[in-house]
Amino acid sequence: MAVAGVALALLGSCGGMTDQEKAMIGKYYISAVSDTHPLLELGEDNKAVVRAIRPGELSFSVEGVWHVRNDSLVIDNDVSSIAIEEGDPSLVGTVAEHVGWPIKHYDETTLRIERAGIIYDYHRRMN
């Protein structure tokens, strides 16, 4: 009985969000790309939505699960969840099932990450 209790406690401690992840929950925008749709949504229970937008051509989103691991934002995308919001679906191309982006800086309003050698500032809105 005690062994079962310890096992349940260990399983429970593996789940949930870290304090850092809880602090990062929100919708993140790059206003040069879109002021109306967040490019990154980091939700409760580690649910994520990543949006790709090429203004006037294509906009789509994919759902996934996110975590912060080793100072990186890691997202496991569910590629079956791709939703076309605007444009031709044949333009989507390949969506990565797993991404990891180094976090360069984080505060209450800005998440700075590195993607393919380029630094991006995502601005969080509390809406």
Put a short name on every predicted segment.
Residues 14-127:
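Lipid interaction determinants
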Residues 1-12:
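Sec-dependent bacterial lipoprotein signal peptides
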